Amino acid sequence: MKVFLLTILLCFLIAYCAGTNIFDPDNNPMCIPQGEKCVMRDFGCCLPYQCDWMKNRCK
């Protein structure tokens, strides 16, 4: 049963990532604008900004 639930969760994660299209920031409505709060260094911020991990803001 655990394997089944894990498989379903994995499918949802893959669909979510494919749906937001993290590799094409121009088509990504989920990207974070400059100055907004971010969590991970490489994901989330609109290009050309990156997440400043010291301040947790896109810059």
Curated annotation (Swiss-Prot):
| Signal peptide positions (record) | 1-19
Can you name a GO cellular component term?
extracellular region
**Lineage: superkingdom:** Eukaryota
* Disulfide cysteine pairs (residue numbers): 31-46, 38-51, 45-58
What does the entry's free-text domain comment contain? The presence of a 'disulfide through disulfide knot' structurally defines this protein as a knottin.
- Give the family, as the similarity comment puts it: Belongs to the venom Ptu1-like knottin family.
Query: What is the name listed in the Swiss-Prot or TrEMBL entry for this protein?
Result: U-reduvitoxin-Pr6a
